């Protein structure tokens, strides 16, 4: 994919890898307060971004809809079946090595216990706690949408 980038007022054509992913914004009512919502976050345990936090999800496979990909990824990563709700937003983010398109969906748990099969750690965060972890840059872009 060819992307046009504007830098210092000049147009530069740059070949950049494009990765399209889906992210689950799994939410529930707080266990301590039935009036407050919590959002599930996971911590990476590998690679360049080890120890950074993200919303669970992953890459879409050929022929999958975003909803199908999200259900598959959460089952693979967390052994949990989810209901995929509305599309909250799509984040476009330029990492140094690639451009990321991340489709973010509100989700709820149908069954399963959110077992960490690929992640280092996980936390349920209230809206006030969202800034208490170090988010991957693209995921950090999503935080403003969750504070409303």
Would you name each region that the model predicts?
Residues 81, 90-113, 123:
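Active-site-adjacent beta-strand/loop module that shapes the phosphate/pyrophosphate-binding cleft
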Residues 106, 115-146:
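NUDIX/MutT-family hydrolases
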């Amino acid at each position: 994919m060819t992307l046009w980038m504007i830098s210092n007022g000049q147009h530069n054509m740059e070949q950049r890898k494009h990765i399209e992913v889906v992210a689950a914004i799994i939410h529930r009512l707080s266990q301590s307060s039935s009036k407050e919502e919590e959002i599930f976050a996971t911590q990476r345990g590998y690679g360049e971004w080890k120890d950074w936090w993200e919303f669970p999800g992953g890459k879409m496979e050929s022929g999958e809809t975003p909803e199908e990909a999200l259900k598959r990824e959460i089952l693979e990563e967390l052994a949990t079946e989810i209901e995929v709700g509305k599309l909250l937003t799509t984040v476009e983010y330029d990492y140094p090595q690639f451009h990321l398109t991340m489709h973010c969906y509100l989700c709820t748990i149908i069954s399963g216990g959110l077992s960490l099969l690929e992640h280092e750690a996980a936390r349920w965060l209230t809206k006030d706690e969202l800034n208490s972890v170090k988010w991957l840059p693209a995921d950090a872009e999503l935080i403003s949408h969750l504070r409303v």
